[in-house]
Amino acid sequence: MFKVFGFGAKEEIPELSQEEKTKAILKQAHDFEQALRAMDYVLDDNADEGLALLDESDAKEASDQTINALARGVIEFLEATLGFEAEEMKKASATLAKAEALSLKSRERAQKIGLKSSSLYPPGTVYAVTYTESCLLHALLMIFSESMMEAAKAILKLRKSYYMLQEILETIKAANKAKKLKITSGSEDKESTPATFITGGDAFNSVDIPYELTPEEQKDKDLLQFAEQIHSMRTKRLSGAHIGNSPAINRLRGELGLQAMEDLPEEEITDHKVLSDDIDLSQATIDEFVHSGVNLCFGILQVVISLLPPAIGAVLSVVGFRGSREEGLRLVWKATKQRNVHGCIGLLALMFYYDGPFQFTDDDFDIPAAVKDSSNSEDSEDEEMDGPTLLHPGKILEDALLQSRALFPNSALWLLNEARMLSGKGRLEEAVALMDSIDVSKIRMRQVKSLMIFDRAITLIHLHQYDRAAEDILSLLDISDWSHAFYTYFAGCCYLENWRMCEMGLMKSDKKDEYQKKAEELIFTSVNLLGKKTFKSKNLPLDRFILRKVEQFKAKKEELGVENPLDGIATSPVHEISYFYNGYNRMSEEHLELTKKMLTEYRNPAIEALDSDQELIKDLLVSLTLRRLGHIQEGCDILDEKVLPKFFSIQNGKVKYIKKTEDPWAYPTALYERALFTWKLEGMDGLPESKEWLLRAQGYADDYELSTRVGMKIKAAIDRVDHSL
């Protein structure tokens, strides 16, 4: 009955009657709903069921191969980017390339037959969106490739995506404007009137068919049954009852944490209620896909471009890329309001931005954003989030996450993000308790399992629970192929700190000798694993970091002539790892005091040698600890007197850098942190000086280990200062 598209056929495309077009439009909406359901299964930690659903759809006659290929590509993209494993990335790239090609063919076909499946946009628009989405995701995977040729191709793909997204976004704006004019004038367009079926005296409106039906179609029972089926699929998806769970409203909480989960009412709601007033129940599936897809892709693209270092950003601007972080964030936030995979990916991106391990919005740099007057902007009614809210979304982000937790109760991915949010709020013990509430061995997605264990280990070192952190991190050797060298080094650093705490009498344990032995073995053998079990054959930034550190430790041992290799290690390296993962912003006062004690009171031959470079690392970390403890001026004085003079000075009004390579990450980081000290001491009056420090941090070096991580943080801070000046 619904054999309309004839995918794979080489014959000329015939003209379709309205009845044939109506059937094709409903089939398209059905297949998109099926694909959205399949992707939601993955987000509920059931990738097998999602892929089986796509296999079932592919086997059916005249199914929409384009959306199925994209859905499969999105699933594989999520798996690949969660784990950064070469085979997974290669597999996802091939699928996304197929989706790109199919999208172009489907768009051309829809344009030729005039298949208007949207009341707002011209035929083929939805396939322009599937093309840009598959192109963008494919380009991101290509950027991770070590091939220069692939990286160059990725830039071209990004450029194509960028321009097509701009084109579609303009089409959306024009369509919305036209729609508002019609509403204002009171005119009615038959082409945009939902189809009405009339059978047995009852009427049913199908929002998926954007025009009036013929009298024969209105009474067609098969068409009606199909339209009702699609309506039912959408209703269940919007309520979260489409992937084997009861409606999500039953699990919706108002607060984070385990206690709030225990306080949920026991009585079950069976009605298909939506979680938010933002969800438009009258929106057609295809229109929803277009809106959310464009907002997500264009938003993420702009945020990524805005975070790139100036040198790369300048090159991209020449070929037409320009990124506005504020506009990008606003678009991603719009995408999250849609109850589909685009909204979920958008939320994951926002969680990484606001509460991820690097936290581009540094808690200590809490500058209030300027409120810009947008009253004269023709799009002002669409700007639902102002500058201050975009900067500090607070409860809005929390509620969005809690909705996803309700929608996907079986997913460890969303539980992990709740734990990250708790950690970001300094509720470290609660974060660990939440991660402990799930049996890690039962997490189906291996990449999510790895992330859960890694994040728990990071949180445990912020709590100085090094024994368990080491056990967690070593367990990843059997689960993850990311960086066995870093896992081994990390665990060794944990055992080193435990041994030192035993030495200082801060910890009583009969395992002191075991800690010493494990620390020595793991730290110094970690470098033997470099280049092995990484998602690229060349070493990762953190791999290069540990190689340099271990070589430093070995050189100091030889220089001092000490027998115990651990006596050649000055500043405890676990505190560097804690800084890289934002630990100083998350520790309680109790744990900050313990960190300060470990940094300043432990003694060994390497520390007593007062090596200038090791003292710099120690003094930098102590200054940050003091700032978080509220001793801001004292911390700033340490930075000014003991850290900055070793590589930075101002002579005759000009900045002079002393280029050092001993600890490349520390020098621009110290300049960045100096900007935060100025802000904390002088407030808004100190913003011009803060910006000067940030520009100095940015200008210290173009490329160094961890430069991407540090550079993005600096760039985000500069944009924040600029927004408030």
Curated annotation (Swiss-Prot):
Location within or outside the cell: Cytoplasm; Nucleus
Phosphothreonine: residues bearing it: 196
Superkingdom as given in the UniProt entry: Eukaryota
Any single Pfam family the record assigns to this protein: Iml2-TPR_39
Secretion signal span: none
Q: Name one GO cellular component term.
A: mitochondrial outer membrane
Positions of post-translational Phosphoserine modification: 246, 377, 380
Major subcellular location class? cytoplasm
Keywords noted in UniProt? Cytoplasm, Nucleus, Phosphoprotein
Under the heading InterPro entries, the entry gives:
Iml2/TPR_39 (IPR019412), TPR-like_helical_dom_sf (IPR011990)
- The answer to whether UniProt assigns keyword Nucleus to this entry is yes
Q: Which PANTHER family match?
A: TETRATRICOPEPTIDE REPEAT PROTEIN 39 FAMILY MEMBER, TETRATRICOPEPTIDE REPEAT PROTEIN 39C
- Which family does the UniProt entry place this protein in? Belongs to the IML2 family.
Q: What does this protein do?
A: May be involved in mitochondrial DNA stability.
Task: Tell me the protein's name.
Answer: IML2-like protein SCY_3392
Q: Which organism is it from?
A: Saccharomyces cerevisiae (strain YJM789)
